Amino acid sequence: MLLEPARRSLDGGKVIGDTAVPVTGDIADHGAEAEYEEAAEILTAPFPVLTCPGNHDARPAHRKALLGDAPGDGPVNQVHHITGTTILMCDSTIPGRDEGRLDARTLDWIDTTLTALTRDTPALIAFRQPPVELHHPLPDSGMLEDPGQLAELLEAHPQVAAVLTGHAHTAAASTFAARPLIVGPAVTWTLRMPWEGDRPADRDQPPGLAFHVLDDDRRLTTHYRVVL
């Protein structure tokens, strides 16, 4: 997460109403403790800023600087209850690799957390790597591994309204486990699709963000914006 684009994206999220900002990973670039200390300052806001690790992150430093916890190597999973909606921020990282996986501990945590909710409490699940192909060789080489395990788990939890991910550096929408799958836009550089030219990275695009609106019918509507 580069500092100035991150500040601009967070400022763009300061809207009136019941607001929380999920950040699906890559809080740091190199996993250095100093990067997280800077990020902690930027991510301080008058509304909840929810984070999970990405493939560039280091769990011990993430825990210490952003959560105030003792450093540890286990998955960094958190649950947040925001004005009637439960948001599960899940750790899908495999240390040292771009691909992701929700390991047995995390899948069990997701199941236990959702089981504890009433069926009329809507939930969102967020993690780093998309569980489906986005039809670009770069993000598709670093997808979530074994996504069928999560899909099977979600069959027992109809209160999950949508799945939110990042990682791809391009805003995208698809479906997963009969639910909306929303991929957040890039804060730093934007991925160019194969039909947009030979250069894979467009570093001139401004940072982006997505506004998610979850209504009383559990319908998720997403509006994408760039921050100029």
Predicted stretch roles:
Residues 153, 175-228:
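Binuclear metal-dependent phosphoesterase catalytic core
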Residues 84-94, 124-128, 179-185, 223-225:
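Active-site-proximal beta-strand elements of phosphoester/diester hydrolases
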Residues 32-119, 149, 155-159, 177, ...:
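Extended active-site neighborhood of metal-dependent phosphoesterases/phosphodiesterases
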Residues 22, 50-52, 88, 164, ...:
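Hydrophobic/aromatic beta-strand patches that form the interior of the parallel beta-sheet core
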Residues 25-27, 55-56, 92-93, 129-130, ...:
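Active-site metal-binding loops of divalent metal-dependent hydrolases
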